[in-house]
């Protein structure tokens, strides 16, 4: 498979993994390793990045193996998102940022206007910007035109496990994009991840589907395989759907009984 390219970085794995809500730090570490992910995302507001005396998951990982993708979860305005992003960058962890500006506490759907504003401000400051957005086709294009390095449309609401609700819109976003499209949020199981990749997505970001599973480590491995299978299937090119049957064996030369 081809490498996933985001800005100046290249990755072998197309699975991006969130680091929240695992049963324990040990399970989290095992799941991260089982997933094969090379990009790990975390909420800056939930990390003690400037308090070394406080435990956090970064302490138990070999950071030479991973690229960290801080996110601005908790931000309600563009200005809040920018402040959080600056805090992450000041820690020296990474220059990539996942822009997340929530517009509705009940659905956790992103605020399109504030997301666009935050992305523009952060791009001006030299960040590598990956905005979390809805499956709005026009907004996705506007974010790309702004200069975002990848687009991250949601499959369904965060943590809902509903899978891909609108595959048509996702396919439109993917078709028109000239930057990576990473399906983010709502993935419930391996079939959802595989479908996202079969649609042509460049990657999948998930968290709750693994951390909330009965066996997070086993689910992490399942997601790894699903993303790989979906991408291989997309690159191979599936057969077109037809209304009627088509024999899989050649009919030439068959004797008449």
From Swiss-Prot:
Reactions listed under catalytic activity: [ThiS sulfur-carrier protein]-C-terminal-Gly-aminoethanethioate + 2-iminoacetate + 1-deoxy-D-xylulose 5-phosphate = [ThiS sulfur-carrier protein]-C-terminal Gly-Gly + 2-[(2R,5Z)-2-carboxy-4-methylthiazol-5(2H)-ylidene]ethyl phosphate + 2 H2O + H(+)
Gene Ontology MF terms in the entry: thiazole synthase activity
Domain of life, source organism: Bacteria
Subcellular location: Cytoplasm
Assigned EC number: 2.8.1.10
Presence of the UniProt keyword Transit peptide in the record: no
Active site location: 98
Main enzyme class: transferase
Chief place where the protein resides: cytoplasm
One of the GO biological process terms: thiamine diphosphate biosynthetic process
Residues passing through the membrane, by range: none
Record family assignment: Belongs to the ThiG family.
Protein name (Swiss-Prot/TrEMBL): Thiazole synthase
Organism annotation: Geobacillus kaustophilus (strain HTA426)
Classification lineage: Bacteria, Bacillati, Bacillota, Bacilli, Bacillales
């Amino acid at each position: 498979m081809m490498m996933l390219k985001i800005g100046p970085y290249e990755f072998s794995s197309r699975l991006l993994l969130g680091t929240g809500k695992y049963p324990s730090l040990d399970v989290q570490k095992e799941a991260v390793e089982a997933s094969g992910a090379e990009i790990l995302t975390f909420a800056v507001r939930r990390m003690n990045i400037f308090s070394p005396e406080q435990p956090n998951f970064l302490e138990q990982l070999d950071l030479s193996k991973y690229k960290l993708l801080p996110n601005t979860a908790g931000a309600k305005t563009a200005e809040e998102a920018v402040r959080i992003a600056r805090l992450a960058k000041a820690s020296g962890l990474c220059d990539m940022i996942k822009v997340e500006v929530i517009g509705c506490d009940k659905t956790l759907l992103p605020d399109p206007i504030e997301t666009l504003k935050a992305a523009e401000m952060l791009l001006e400051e030299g960040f590598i910007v990956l905005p979390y957005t809805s499956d709005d086709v026009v907004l996705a294009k506007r974010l790309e035109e702004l200069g975002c390095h990848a687009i991250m449309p949601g499959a369904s609401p965060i943590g809902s496990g509903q899978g891909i609700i609108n595959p048509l819109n996702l396919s439109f976003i993917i078709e028109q994009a000239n930057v990576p499209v990473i399906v983010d949020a709502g993935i419930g199981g391996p079939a959802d991840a595989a479908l996202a990749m079969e649609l042509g997505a460049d990657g999948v970001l998930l968290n709750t589907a693994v951390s909330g599973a009965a066996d997070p480590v086993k689910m992490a491995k399942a997601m790894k395989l699903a993303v790989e299978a979906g991408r291989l299937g997309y690159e191979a090119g599936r057969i077109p759907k037809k209304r009627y049957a088509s024999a899989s064996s050649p009919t030439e030369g068959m004797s008449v009984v």
